Curated annotation (Swiss-Prot):
Descriptive protein name: Truncated secreted TNF-receptor-like protein A53
InterPro entries on file: TNFR/NGFR_Cys_rich_reg
Signal peptide feature range: none
Keyword set, alphabetical order: Disulfide bond, Late protein, Repeat
Presence of keyword Disulfide bond: yes
Sequence ranges of the TNFR-Cys repeats: 36-73, 74-103
UniProt similarity note: Belongs to the poxviridae A53R protein family.
Disulfide bridges in this chain: C37-C50, C51-C64, C54-C72
Organism of provenance: Vaccinia virus (strain Copenhagen)
Domain of life: Viruses
PROSITE patterns: TNFR_NGFR_1 (PS00652), TNFR_NGFR_2 (PS50050)
Further comment found in the protein's record: The A53R protein from Western Reserve and Copenhagen strains are predicted to be inactive because of mutations that introduce stop codons or frameshifts when compared to other poxiviruses.
Length: 103
């Protein structure tokens, strides 16, 4: 296990997502091993395949289908996601502020 100083964990996570989603890692689905998937992925139980979660700032335009992986797209202006997700929606910043989700 690598111990990172304050602030470096975010950098490491950012690099992981860059490599995983933009360079080509994780382009295809694969069968889950012992029912588990790698970091940044989720188990699609319908197909027993490991699929990409979308990184923060993106949402699932198309969910994985067992052959093709999740297709992520940047969130529209004034919306966001803060965690890797598989949702096909984003949170409206104005609504989040009204609901006290942003402090």
């Amino acid at each position: 296990m690598i111990i990172l100083k304050d602030g470096y964990k975010e950098f490491a996570d950012c690099m992981y997502y860059f490599l995983h989603y933009y360079i080509g890692y994780g382009r295809y689905t694969y069968s889950a091993t012992n029912g588990s998937c790698d970091k940044g992925e989720y188990l699609d139980k319908r197909h027993n395949q490991c699929c990409n979660r979308c990184p923060p700032g993106e949402f699932a335009k198309v969910r994985c289908n067992g052959n093709d992986n999740t297709k992520c797209e940047r969130c529209p202006p004034h919306t966001y996601t803060t965690i890797p997700i598989i949702l096909m929606d984003v949170i409206n910043v104005e609504n989040a502020q009204q609901d006290h989700l942003i402090r």
